[in-house]
Amino acid sequence: MASVASSTVFASSLPHHRATTRAPPTPPRIPRRARLPGRSVVSCLPKRGSEKLVVTRASDEEGPPEPAGQGRGGGRAWPSLDASSCGLALAAAAGVLMLQGSQQALAGTEFMGMQDVVGDLGDISTGFASAFLLIFFSELGDRTFFIAALLAARNSGAIIFLGTFGALAVMTIISVVLGRAFHYVDGIIPFSFGGTDFPVDDFLAACLLVYYGVTTLLDAASGDEEKMNEEQEEAELAVSKFLGNGAGIISAASTIASTFVLVFIAEWGDKSFFSTIALAAASSPLGVIAGSLAGHAVATLIAVLGGSLLGTFLSEKIVAYIGGSLFLAFAAVTLVEIVNS
């Protein structure tokens, strides 16, 4: 009886035990997201009882995809932006703005630097006109002029022109570089006079132009035939040592090289060399280079085509008067600019 009673009690208590047992929790349903066909969607849900994220991946095979751009209830599903995405977007926008600002600043700096080196259009035109007139009338009747004329009488005119103009072009570039270097040194180490910065380079350039103008006018006014023919005699002496007949490619190259060396040595330290330095120190270097090259080209062309015929139309004394007057005129213009500045 005791065993039957105990089994009865155990049987009666079993349903009560099952009723009080709690069922295991069901995992939350993963919401569907709008996705494109063939693409998988990643959903991050926090795991119950921990801070870690459980990543589950739902593919298109689990069910038919919903129409793109719609969520539950037919509404439009807008993409969610987290803090990291917003930060990256702001950083990218700031980087683009900074890059554009730096490019504009760099372009402005380069423009200012080029304007300081080259000068504006007004300075270029003034430098071109000054250099052309000064070099042209300085080279007419000069030693280089007679060298080109005498060489052209014995060789091909085109070959002599190439050698002569090449040497004068190199000499012009060297003169302009020296003049601009002196100009920049004066800007780095300014000389103060009366509380203001005094342009030493412009003043020395004006003094150099005055010197050559006065000496040229004195030589023209003296009327000394020996002084007037000195340049031609020196040219004949230099040409007497010249070799080459300009025939053939090798001989033509040798003639051009010999002419280049001869004219370069004769032009080094000449009045046109120092006058170009003076103009480059006070004017636009681009205008001075262009004007000097144009003046050398025209004067050399006249010498090659018929330098001996120049005396029949224009005497050396008149050329000297014109050249000396131009030297003094450009010196006066430079001094006026110094006073006005």
Curated annotation (Swiss-Prot):
Topology relative to the membrane, per the entry? Multi-pass membrane protein
Renumbered to this chain, region (Disordered) spans 1-41, 54-76
- GO MF entries: calcium ion transmembrane transporter activity; manganese ion transmembrane transporter activity
Q: Where is the transit peptide?
A: 1-57
Cite the InterPro entries for this sequence: GDT1-like
Q: Where in the cell?
A: Plastid, Chloroplast membrane
The disulfides recorded in the entry are none
Q: Name one GO biological process term.
A: Golgi calcium ion homeostasis
Q: Coiled-coil annotation: which residues?
A: none
Asked whether the keyword Kinase is assigned, the reply is no
Q: Which Pfam families match?
A: GDT1
Keywords, comma-separated and alphabetical: Chloroplast, Membrane, Plastid, Transit peptide, Transmembrane, Transmembrane helix
Mark out the compositionally biased spans (Low complexity). Answer: 1-13
Q: Which GO terms of the cellular component aspect does the record hold?
A: chloroplast membrane; chloroplast thylakoid membrane; Golgi apparatus
Q: Give the residue spans that cross the bilayer.
A: 79-99, 117-137, 158-178, 203-223, 246-266, 286-306, 318-338
Which protein family is named in the record?
Answer: Belongs to the GDT1 family.
PANTHER family with a match to the protein in the record? PROTEIN PAM71, CHLOROPLASTIC, TRANSMEMBRANE PROTEIN HTP-1 RELATED
Q: What is this protein called?
A: GDT1-like protein 1, chloroplastic
User: Organism, per UniProt?
Assistant: Oryza sativa subsp. indica
